[in-house]
Amino acid sequence: MPSSTPGGSLKHLSDLTPPSQDRTWLTSSHPRLPIAATCCADKSVRVYSLVNFTLLSTISGGHKRSVRSCAWKPHVKGESVLATASFDATVGVWRRWDGFGRAERDMLGLAGGLAEADRQEGDDTDGDEEDEDEEWGFAVLLDGHDSEVKSVSWSSGGSLLATCSRDKSIWIWEDLEDGDNNFETVAVLQEHSGDVKWVAWHPEEECLASGSYDDTIRLWREDVDDWGQVACLRGHEGTVWCVEWEAPTSIAGDNGDGAPTTMPIDPENGKLAPCERKKWIEERSMSGPRLVSCSDDKTIRIWRKQPQEKPPPVQYSSIPSTIRPATIDETWIEECQLPAMHDLSIYSVAWSKKTGLIASTGADGRIVIYQERFTSKPPVHTTSEQDKPDSARETQKANGERTAPSTAWEVVACVDAAHEIYEVNHVCWAKRADQRKSQQQNFDNSEMDHANEEEVLLSTGDDGVVRVWTLER
């Protein structure tokens, strides 16, 4: 099963046990805790430990058909909030306090030190009461879609929830956070002409990306009080199954949460001049995070936003400013296609926020890992750059503007039949806590040590199994 590519090996570390007896669709890793939630065809969500890969709890009773997608709400302290999307046309929101009981601590391998801490604090709570507190609470059911809900995503700030459906619509809901689990519908977007398969929020801004059966990717933003489409990305020749954002990049070389910038690999062992690296970071910072998409057409494409040009000098107009339209449209270009490695539809792509690696999988049961590297080849001009008027290019030369060093993507690992004869529906990167370090700290109140955590890849298959992989290089 391991890969045979020269760049690295994808090693099967473990399965999450016990597996589901029905098809599993997607797994979502918690933003703070070493746990992951898996969506199942049996109408349930299974929550597993990423410390010892065992089942912690099963969330059920809220949906009447398969749970197709789920997402953890970010920036929530003291509790975990999970949104679930179902084929029954509804979206559920579940809540649970992060105070895990002793039974779960045993499963996580955390019982020793924590049990002693409880005794020192005088914790003599009855076990039955503790078990009751551990239950997930079904907070609210969001109803509005006319057909199967395919994907759900929280905004980076956690106040907005996006859902999409087979009914060709995208709904944006606002969590009022009033203590009564009230949500308000703020937008219903219906520009797609086919099933909407996926929604994903920008990692820093309130900008939403969607992929559809109509072969397009669309970007949405709020303008004043109305949400609307700001870009339509065309290029795929089949259903767009998944879109994912790159981690933010800053000139300082830090992505905002203490993790290093996901720079491309330098194949010449550091010979790339620091000024060239800085130029690459500056250009990426101006463009913002890129998008990766995968499709029925068996391609994976990287998309980049073109920075907006400086506004022209102010010209007085007889038209009042209150009725002059403000342009919020964005221009996106297809930057490249990743090496062709899949024989059938590609269902899922995942862009690591820690390493910058991209993982893909699909109907052929293959998992592929790609990395970006700097290349000595001159930058390839995109069609839109070639179409620039001569005056614009002359202006660039006059201003001494330089093009950032070019990059290319290469395959570093590939595994065939990752789930034997079954299709693989989803892959995602996850943070795995070190079990020995976790035993030394109070799991209830601590976040994972981001500097020392290990990143693993989770694959979710039609066989009901979620597999854990590590990349060895």
From Swiss-Prot:
Signal peptide feature range: none
Basic and acidic residues: compositionally biased ranges: 384-400
Family as reported in the entry's similarity comment: Belongs to the WD repeat CIA1 family.
The protein's role, per its UniProt record: Essential component of the cytosolic iron-sulfur (Fe/S) protein assembly machinery. Required for the maturation of extramitochondrial Fe/S proteins.
WD repeat ranges per the UniProt record: 11-58, 62-104, 144-183, 191-230, 235-313, 341-380, 438-473
Gene Ontology CC, one term: cytosolic [4Fe-4S] assembly targeting complex
Protein name stated in the entry: Probable cytosolic iron-sulfur protein assembly protein 1
Biased segments, Acidic residues type: 123-133
UniProt keywords, alphabetically: Repeat, WD repeat
